[in-house]
Every structure is written in structure tokens, then in C-alpha cells.
Amino acid sequence: MAPPQTIPRRGLFIGGAWREPCLGRRLPVVNPATEATIGDIPAGTAEDVEIAVAAARDAFSRDGGRHWSRAPGAVRANFLRAIAAKIKDRKSELALLETLDSGKPLDEASGDMDDVAACFEYYADLAEALDGKQQSPISLPMENFKSYVLKEPIGVVGLITPWNYPLLMATWKVAPALAAGCTTILKPSELASVSCLELGAICMEIGLPPGVLNIITGLGPEAGAPLSSHSHVDKVAFTGSTETGKRIMISAAQMVKPVSLELGGKSPLIVFDDIGDIDKAVEWTMFGIFANAGQVCSATSRLLLHEKIAKKFLDRLVAWAKNIKVSDPLEEGCRLGSVISEGQYEKIKKFISTARSEGATILYGGGRPQHLRRGFFLEPTIITDVSTSMQIWQEEVFGPVICVKEFRTESEAVELANDTHYGLAGAVISNDQERCERISKALHSGIIWINCSQPCFVQAPWGGNKRSGFGRELGEWGLDNYLTVKQVTKYCSDEPWGWYQPPSKL
């Protein structure tokens, strides 16, 4: 029996309960693999944001914070582990919903759910460990003072997340924010909110204190903008486009509000001629750009090939690309599903046509797979004869499209790799480990992969440089995003300070 092609009907999740949006509006949810409407989500607006922020502020300060913000980290850890357990219990259902909502292969969505559960478990451990790090002493040069550090939650945080890994990207923010003791308003992308709303259902099941996590779905200008500019939101964490990130920075600057931004990328993958196994390098190249249909901020979308191996490498890359199963994402073995929406589909096609008009060669792909007449599907696409002035070299496509240039020397490869406004990630494949270490230091990126592309571990920091944003998610750095550091210094001497001449005694 085929799985159901519908989604649960949910409201906004505010104050631990479901609420219909104040204006009563809802947005259709379209399965991008079939173009069928499979349900709808609530369309929140500024009025709903106001209610959610009030719920979060109340949850932060309720009873002096003893139930959440000032509770022991071990208390919060119990809730995070309970969420992780429910994610595992509902893994198959959540993966299916995410596939229906986003068009990604079911295998990929299933793996994402494993990562979601692991992320909540990891930050549960860090929440517990935080208890032991409070009042860390500071060594001072004066014996009559003692000083220590407190780490405290920032407060109410707005979390605005993208559509490419809907629940996972939300979890990268929700889990550390809750571990820190913050209360939160999550605003997922309107293009893929279904699994995030199910997180609200899970929080109800486990008894998360009301208002600790609130979920507002809706359009960016109507819900995201009021959230990022709200005077009672203490921080905004955003993952998405560079242009939206700029607007959030401008809004936050009016209140000197901290933000962390994980934005776009145009990451390079450099392959040298000393590799022993071309197919091994080709597969990593494929994974770096065709996984999740290339809708990955860190996708290694610029391939730099040493001129001595370029032809042989491209021949194998085309052969491997032809072998990818592009299909309905629910089919077993699917490795390339649809892109997220009609708008994204048309945007990617425009990038490809512009590359062709500017003189590039579409070596493989570039259009709709002939066997798929419906849905927003694109072939894996390889573009050669690219110059650095072309749009396809400079701008983020966010689709299954890779552009290729050749190089002769290591210094030329590094120069080409750094020829971008972005700085999220970079990769190098070579058997010369000293060369790999040199290039790791030379690339202007926050993440470097050696002999691979795209591995991601919750224990390691994630974030970029330049127009790819600032701040780091994941690992202990992800927790620090949601903590403030407070210095406490005590004067311990029985003697007076003695700076001023005392008045005469009566």
C-alpha cells in the first residue's frame, strides 16, 4: 500500500498549545515531486509573533526562571533527551512528511532524522556539563580579590531556519538554545514547515514547559521580519540567503541586538593530478553537489581540476552522473529528488541558460529528466568552459549544478578557489598530505574537507567567513551562541580599599 500523501493539520504552536493564526490565513503545501497540494500550514503574522514573544518572555522569567532559564542544566537535558527519543520513535513518519514537503529522497530524509535525534542528545550532554562549568575561577594578580565567571542564557531568541534540511537546520538552533536555558520562537521557511510543526507536537507529548519553544509558520515578510525586529527578542539566529541576512543585520543594528548568520556559499573542490583512484574522487565530487539536489549552503559547486587529469576525470564524472537514479523521492534507491519549489526550479534553469548564453558548455544535463513529466526535477548538470566573470562561477545556484575550471599550479588553484565573495567551505583531494595542509590554511573558508566533501558532525563547528556569515553552530561553539558571560568579582580583604583620604572621625 502506498503511503498517504497528506500532512497533519496543525496550528501555530504558542505557549505549549495549538492556536489558529490571528488573521485566520493558511498557506498551501505543495509536494514538489508531484506538484499536488497535500495540505496547508498556518500563515502567522506580526500579531501572532507578538503573542509568541510574550509567551517566550513569560517562560523565561516564570517563577524567577527556576523551571527553565535558571534550572540546573540536568533538568533541561532530560527534556532534550525526551525529544530525541520521540524523534527516534517517529523517525519513519517524520522522514516521510519531510520527503512529501521538500522532495528530497526518503533515504536522505531518514538519515536527517537520525541526525536530529543525535543533535538533541549531544546538547543534552552539554546542558548537563554546563552545571559543572559555572563559577569557573579566574586567576587574578591581587590576592584581595576573587573572581569567577557565570554563563547565562541570552534570553528570548528568534530562530529563522531554511527549507533545505527543514527539521535538522531547526534543530541545530533549537537544541543548543534550549540547552543554554533560552526560550525560543522558531520561524521555519514557509516552503518546508511540516516537520517543524511536528516538533511542536513532540514538545507537547513530553511536557516541555509552555512557551519554551514556540513555532510560527508563515511568509518571511509577514512573520520572519516582525520576529527579527522585535524589541523583546534578545538575539536572532538565521540560516538562509545572504540578502535576507543583510536585512536582519540592519534590523538588529537598530537595537544593537546580537545576531548569528549562516548564509550562502560557492564552495570550491580542488582535485590534484596525484590522486590514485579517480572514481573515489568522482564520487566525493558527486556527493558534494548532487546530494539533496545541490540545495546545500556548503555545496562544492565549483570544481577545480588539474589540467593533466581534467579530461579523464570529466569522462568519469559524466558516467557517474548518468548512473544517478533521478526519480520520485519515495522510490527505493532514489539519489536525486526534486528541488523545493517551482520558483527554485525556474531560478536554476535560468542560471543554466545564462551560462550557455555567456559561452559555457553544458557538458551533461541541463534540463528535465525525460521520464519525469511532473514535479520540479532537474538532471544533474555539469558545466565546463567557464570563466571567472560568468554568473555561474560567481553566484550561488542552490541546485544540482557544478561548474568546472582547470588549473596548472597549486597557487593558481588557491587563487581560483578564493575568487568568491563567500567563505563557507572548501575541499581538496590529493595524495600529498603536506599539500592538503597548506591548502587548508590558504583557503578563506570556515570549513575545510580533505579527500572528501560535506561530512558534518554535531561535535565540530560549522560556519563561514566573508559573505557566508559569522558565528559558529554545532559543537560547544553552538552552545556559546546562546550564552552570555558574566564576570563576578568579590573583594575579600578586611582592610579598607584606601584610595580616598577618609574624613576625620566625629
Swiss-Prot record:
Does the entry feature the keyword DNA damage, yes or no?
no
Per the UniProt record, the site (Transition state stabilizer) maps to 164
Which keywords belong to this entry?
Metal-binding, NAD, Oxidoreductase, Sodium
Q: Where do the annotations place Na(+) binding?
A: 101, 191
EC number(s) of the enzyme? 1.2.1.-, 1.2.1.47, 1.2.1.19, 1.2.1.54
- Report the SUPFAM superfamilies cross-referenced here: ALDH-like (SSF53720)
Entry keyword Zinc-finger:
no
InterPro entries noted in UniProt = Ald_DH/histidinol_DH (IPR016161), Ald_DH_C (IPR016163), Ald_DH_CS_CYS (IPR016160), Ald_DH_CS_GLU (IPR029510), Ald_DH_N (IPR016162), Aldehyde_DH_dom (IPR015590)
Query: What protein is this chain from?
Result: Aminoaldehyde dehydrogenase 2
